Amino acid sequence: MATKQAHKRLTKEYKLMVENPPPYILARPNEDNILEWHYIITGPADTPYKGGQYHGTLTFPSDYPYKPPAIRMITPNGRFKPNTRLCLSMSDYHPDTWNPGWSVSTILNGLLSFMTSDEATTGSITTSDHQKKTLARNSISYNTFQNVRFKLIFPEVVQENVETLEKRKLDEGDAANTGDETEDPFTKAAKEKVISLEEILDPEDRIRAEQALRQSENNSKKDGKEPNDSSSMVYIGIAIFLFLVGLFMK
């Protein structure tokens, strides 16, 4: 249970953070326990954490601000072990270096600075930039669908996340459709249904198609397979391909 002084100090700090939130940082106390704070760090643009959404906790002692909090990061991030106490100069690992004048904002700014550095410490891990970028992209989905505490503390952020994920899905779908529209004629032709040789009107194109069919049958025989009963049919991909080639050759 928080002392009167700790409660007063943390209430004041929360008010200050609401009025003047530090860049990339959102933090608030648990409504049922002012000693338990939750934060979200948004990955800065010039780092492998760009666009990432990193949730963690600050667990303050009852006699704060005279002793430092325990610091943890819950969202997988590639920099720290998830849900593990971190050894930082402003954490409970180093009460001897703690300054009572430091605040929640000071602590989280220090955590962000350490996160974007390469310095090792207890609770840190080493991963590639590619892994960090992958985790950054997956972080919103993780917090929204797998992180129970995140959903309880930041319900409005969860709603924003759902909208972000839906938009991302639509954008990716549009990109895939655009790719189909710009597909070259030969590739598109190869995906179409079959037609008969009789439907190929141009004599030269029909000859080419017949040659392709015979070659296909010969290959089947070499592989020990019987020609299919529908061997009089060829893929429209071949037909159109040959037709287009014929146009260029004429």
Curated annotation (Swiss-Prot):
Show where the UBC core domain sits: 5-167
- Lineage of the source organism? Eukaryota, Fungi, Dikarya, Ascomycota, Saccharomycotina
Q: Which residues are responsible for catalysis?
A: 87 (glycyl thioester intermediate)
What InterPro entries does the record point to?
Ub_conjugating_enzyme (IPR050113), UBQ-conjugat_E2_core (IPR000608), UBQ-conjugating_enzyme/RWD (IPR016135)
Miscellaneous comment as given in the Swiss-Prot or TrEMBL entry: Present with 1900 molecules/cell in log phase SD medium.
Native source species: Saccharomyces cerevisiae (strain ATCC 204508 / S288c) (Baker's yeast)
Q: What class of enzyme is it?
A: transferase
Q: What does this protein do?
A: Catalyzes the covalent attachment of ubiquitin to other proteins. Functions in degradation of misfolded or regulated proteins localized in the endoplasmic reticulum (ER) lumen or membrane via the ubiquitin-proteasome system. Cognate E2 conjugating enzyme for the DOA10 ubiquitin ligase complex, which is part of the ERAD-C pathway responsible for the rapid degradation of membrane proteins with misfolded cytoplasmic domains.
Q: Which reaction does it catalyse?
A: S-ubiquitinyl-[E1 ubiquitin-activating enzyme]-L-cysteine + [E2 ubiquitin-conjugating enzyme]-L-cysteine = [E1 ubiquitin-activating enzyme]-L-cysteine + S-ubiquitinyl-[E2 ubiquitin-conjugating enzyme]-L-cysteine
The listed outcome for residue 87 to S is: Loss of activity
Source taxon at top rank: Eukaryota
Its annotated pathway reads: Protein modification; protein ubiquitination
Q: Which family does it belong to?
A: Belongs to the ubiquitin-conjugating enzyme family.
Taken from the record's topology, the Cytoplasmic segments are 1-232
What gene codes for this chain? UBC6
* Designated name of the protein: Ubiquitin-conjugating enzyme E2 6
